[in-house]
Amino acid sequence: MKIAVNGSDTEVLGASLAAVLEELGYAGAKIATAVNAAFVPAAARQATLLQAGDRVEIVAPQQGG
């Protein structure tokens, strides 16, 4: 199915947010996620099912000062 990941159209096979994150290489990464502008905590990613056209945002923490 086609979804938008960080603003880029992406074809994915996974049905859940957790499966898509693993497919994209984010398994185990310390990241924040949102689907259609709604924050999705790590504990809810497996139960969060995606649909074609959904917008997924993946944000990794940045260090700096």
Model-assigned labels for residue ranges:
Residues 1-64:
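Ubiquitin-like/PB1-type beta-grasp interaction modules and other compact soluble beta-rich domains
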